Amino acid sequence: MSTHGAQVAGLVRRFPDPEKRCGTAPAVAVWRIAKSLVLLRCRSSPMGIVDIGGALAHADLRTPLGLGLYRYGFRTIESRVLVGLLRRDDVVIDGGANIGLFSLLAAATVGPSGRVIACEPSPRTMALLNANANLNGFDVIERHEVALSDQPGTASFVVFDNASGLASFAPGLDGGKVIEVNTATLDDLTARLSAPVAVLKLDVEGAEVKALRGARSMLGRDLPLVLLEVEPGHLGRQGSSVEDLRQTLHPLGYEAYAIRGDARLVKITGPWQPAPAASPNLVLAPAARADRIESLRTPV
């Protein structure tokens, strides 16, 4: 990014919500001018910079993800839930980090004394993740170019040119390119942490069960809250099922919560399935972390 672009990005980052932070007219004016310059830059370049609420992100306007980010911002149901689960100084894992949007929000929430461990196996996507972390000066984001699995090694991985978030272990969706990537377990990645993992976010296109099986020691030790995607079709392509997911976590005392359209959590008393037409994700919470979800739960 040019020097001018870096200065503009710095201004936007400094005043993400100036009316709440200081309320001064000059600050509001600077913020509006800086944001306008960023938008002007986006229109003349395939790469833009977008304020996602608490952080900035590069948006590749040549891709559906980047274009959607530029047009609509990034305030998803899942991002609201993630921020609601986190506390200052937390350790959080972003498995299947893609370009790092959840990692950025997590870093902004946990602060400089927290830690974010971001895992993304696609080299092209990791390059954007690195750029996003550097854009914000988020040194707390520890980045690993690996796919999470139940054992370390290498594996065939299907990636897409548009950083769509659909990359997965082979076999994957049609239209992708197969590459070899390194795999790692969460137990290995977290073995030397000095603080417990508070929140684990997983969106690994059907490999969630593999990732959790590679995290048995960490899960039993830290009992983190888990936010993960549950797509039966994706799980089936990777040789697992929703029941496998339940059998992996339920013995550790985890209860499942569906996510409503208003980002509230509803306890699931039957099969572990997401709420229809809301979010394809579940929050899985052990009793030891029940206090973290109280503010997000619907009244009984």
Residue ranges and their predicted role:
Residues M1-N132, N136, V140, L173, ...:
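S-adenosyl-L-methionine
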Residues R71-V91, F138-E142, T154-S156, S164, ...:
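Short internal loop-to-helix segment that lines adenine-nucleotide cofactor pockets
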Residues I93, C119, L200-L202, L228:
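Active-site flanking residues adjacent to catalytic metal/cofactor-binding acidic residues
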Residues A106-G111, A215-D222, L249:
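Short, conserved loop/helix-junction motifs that constitute active-site signature segments
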Residues P121-T125, L223-R237:
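A short, conserved beta-to-alpha structural element at the edge of catalytic cores
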Residues P123-M126, N130-S164:
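Core alpha/beta nucleotide-donor-binding catalytic domains of modification enzymes
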Residues V242-Y257:
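Conserved Class I S-adenosyl-L-methionine
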